[in-house]
Amino acid sequence: MLATIDPIALRLGPISIHWYAICIVSGLLLAVYLAQRLAPEKGINPEHILDFILLAFPIAIVGARLYYVIFQWSYYSQNPSEIFAIWNGGIAIYGGLIAGAAVLYWFAKRHAIAVLDFLDIAAPGVMIAQSIGRWGNFVNQEAYGKAVSQLNYLPEIIRQQMFIDGSYRVPTFLYESLWNLVGFSIILGLRYFNKGLRQGDVTSFYLIWYGLGRFVIEGMRTDSLMFAGLRVSQWVSISIIILGAVLLYFRKQRQKADYKMKN
């Protein structure tokens, strides 16, 4: 039987580099690379991508941590020194997305970039970054599901890491990582095979796909705050699914109106 993975990947004297940080930064770098490759298709200067990331990334991390702390306040109110211990894990993707989206809107307006164009080139990278980032939860043994009797369908390294507090746990991190990976692959397929994608289509797909996955997977977790019979993240998931569907509908209606005007 394998030992659990040390959350610290590397120690350099007093400095500890955590796997959690490596996963986040790796996902970020890949997201930046993809966005810069896609930017010229929308007439966006690739240098704007790096400028945006340097501004948005720290704000998104703060937003993700703030969201997590707010919904775990019963713990952090008793352990205030832990609020800033982000290296121990505990950031909420939705908090980061909300903060990042706010910065993106401001940045796009400031640089006269169409918001939907910016979102369309960002969405593929964000999805693959989320897929990679979930493995940080795996190493930290967090964001898992209910106790189960066995996980024999999984490799031993995952089974052992999901053996927490005397029980095997549903590896919700893995389900979400794979869901996002599939979503990323679909986006690439749509871009390659469907040259008629409209502005906002990729963003709509991202919102609907990610929201559906999170809604289902959050229902398997045991560490999320409940509200009105659902987990808070499930309510947020419903909201972004609706947002994606509404965006898709109105873009379709606009396309029909434009077609009628031309004909």
Curated annotation (Swiss-Prot):
Claim: Cell membrane is one of the keywords in the record: yes
Alphabetical GO biological process terms: lipoprotein biosynthetic process
Species whose genome carries this gene: Streptococcus thermophilus (strain ATCC BAA-250 / LMG 18311)
Subcellular location: Cell membrane
Family: Belongs to the Lgt family.
Gene Ontology MF terms in the entry: phosphatidylglycerol-prolipoprotein diacylglyceryl transferase activity
Pfam families for this protein: LGT
Main subcellular localisation: membrane
Domain of life: Bacteria
Protein's recorded name: Phosphatidylglycerol--prolipoprotein diacylglyceryl transferase
Keyword Membrane in annotation: yes
The encoding gene: lgt
Regions that span the bilayer: 15-35, 52-72, 83-103, 112-132, 170-190, 200-220, 230-250
